Amino acid sequence: MPAYRSRTTTHGRNMAGARGLWRATGMKDGDFGKPIIAVVNSFTQFVPGHVHLKDLGQLVAREIEAAGGVAKEFNTIAVDDGIAMGHDGMLYSLPSREIIADSVEYMVNAHCADAMVCISNCDKITPGMLMASLRLNIPTVFVSGGPMEAGKVVMHGKKVALDLVDAMVAAADDKISDEDVATIERSACPTCGSCSGMFTANSMNCLTEALGLSLPGNGSTLATHSDRKRLFVEAGHLIVDITRRYYEQDDENVLPRNIASKQAFENAMALDIAMGGSTNTVLHILAAAYEGEIDFNLDDIDQLSRRVPCLSKVAPAKQDVHMEDVHRAGGIMRILGELDRGGLINRDCPTVHAPTLGDAIDRWDITRTNSETVREFFRAAPGGVPTQVAFSQSSRWDELDMDRENGVIRSVEKPFSKDGGLAVLKGNIALDGCIVKTAGVDESILKFTGPAKVYESQDSAVKAILSNEVVAGDVVVIRYEGPKGGPGMQEMLYPTSYLKSKGLGKVCALITDGRFSGGTSGLSIGHVSPEAANGGTIGLVRNGDTIAIDIPNRTIELMLSEGELAARRVSQDAAGWKPAEHRKRKVTTALKAYAAFATSADLGAVRKLPE
């Protein structure tokens, strides 16, 4: 039977000093011996996805204490990728994931906490906490802040649903008036919560459901809806239950590494591919698997991508569909239910809230349950009132979206496409692989060949696109933006958004050793590995070289002979693998420290110490 970790600081005469300090935090005689549960919050006023979390940590803490535990709350940092986008702030986004994971480990291990509830929401916070949970392997429940309501506005007599990406695209489109841009800007992000499409934050919060570490509805219940409060209340009780099961009943099935097994990771990626999630999820899932010592890699994702169809298209892939619509169609449990019918997931994986994922699906899939409570839960609708307050409205749709042929979530027999929403490509320009969000690629350019236009930084590419240097048929290559080369592997949302605003979204391709925002669509291929700074072939591309992309056959090739590539490599080795242009970005000691240990994207861009 494992001993409570917290006994190290709460029991024994020699711990009188530690107990004295615990007493100063409010603990009483009767609290020593109870499980000490860390409430890992990420409240900040910088991020709309986290601005409403301030009181939610204490909501969970009260429920933990009502269930017989001791709750102690602390915060991690949280970077808003949208605000950090398009300038040197984006260099810090991906490295912040490691800082978050480390900070959770530091606090939990320093104070010998027995378990934790992770209150996350946005892009790097959920992955960072997920990495920490698998690293620590103590009982953990995830509950996120929830998605933002989609913006709604009437423009030129037509009601339009909006999100963050619409504001970016409109601002770069010379054909849209200043007045209309201002209207879009003011309407795109109306409430607290993670940005309203199937971007990185919402994708990751959905994946925690498939991994079995969060409650049903975690990924899709709106931040503003009163139904979401139940998830926080239930998380507080649930964590005490599974903590006792582990420490008092020796039930290791409740530990993160036993819940988030390789089979669970396969379930999560099957979901990701089916719902057309952000390409960043690949990076984060690989990193989480690494922390959990789980043998799950890019080849596994490639195999899944070849057999899992695309069952849902959400913004940015389908501009008028947002997370509130996914919830109305049954949320993540409905998508998992459709995959289950097709024999595409493992039903036997345990979860924190049900004996198996299959049991959870049978209870929560709206197409197979008779529970009116479940059906009412998924009728939760947006309130349509701008607010930064959680649980502030209780609107309901009149009916659910149960249409399996033409609805937001479709059946395996009637998918949006037989190929899934994500694909792994390989070829001489990406020997270790690269990623494309196929759900956002127009069918007309699934195969694409064109001349390279090479840029040594995101900034140079943006300048070229806005000055009309890039034309239809081009393959834009942005390099030295990988984990080491950036450093920090910046997101390329601005280049892809500007291509769309220039009318080039369906007639150009973009490849990079950097990564993309979950808001990116179009033929945007990221995570090219090895990256240029590590001697990857992307560093050998020259203007005018022909690049051939074939998504159906999963290939990407630089159309040069082996002899020419070898000659260029000799030349580049002599010159050094660094950008040809002088970049003005300031690379601080903190960023250099990340770059020194960062692995390539195909390994999740995690840090590895030299052996």
UniProtKB/Swiss-Prot annotation:
InterPro entries: Dihydro-acid_dehy_C, DihydroxyA_deHydtase, DiOHA_6PGluconate_deHydtase_CS, ILV_EDD_C, ILV_EDD_N, IlvD/EDD_N
Role: Functions in the biosynthesis of branched-chain amino acids. Catalyzes the dehydration of (2R,3R)-2,3-dihydroxy-3-methylpentanoate (2,3-dihydroxy-3-methylvalerate) into 2-oxo-3-methylpentanoate (2-oxo-3-methylvalerate) and of (2R)-2,3-dihydroxy-3-methylbutanoate (2,3-dihydroxyisovalerate) into 2-oxo-3-methylbutanoate (2-oxoisovalerate), the penultimate precursor to L-isoleucine and L-valine, respectively.
Pathway: Amino-acid biosynthesis; L-isoleucine biosynthesis; L-isoleucine from 2-oxobutanoate: step 3/4; Amino-acid biosynthesis; L-valine biosynthesis; L-valine from pyruvate: step 3/4
Organism: Allorhizobium ampelinum (strain ATCC BAA-846 / DSM 112012 / S4)
PROSITE patterns given in the database record: ILVD_EDD_1, ILVD_EDD_2
Assigned EC number: 4.2.1.9
GO cellular component terms, A-Z: cytosol
GO BP annotation list: isoleucine biosynthetic process; L-valine biosynthetic process
Name recorded for this polypeptide: Dihydroxy-acid dehydratase
Cofactor note: Binds 1 [2Fe-2S] cluster per subunit. This cluster acts as a Lewis acid cofactor.
Entry's transmembrane regions: none
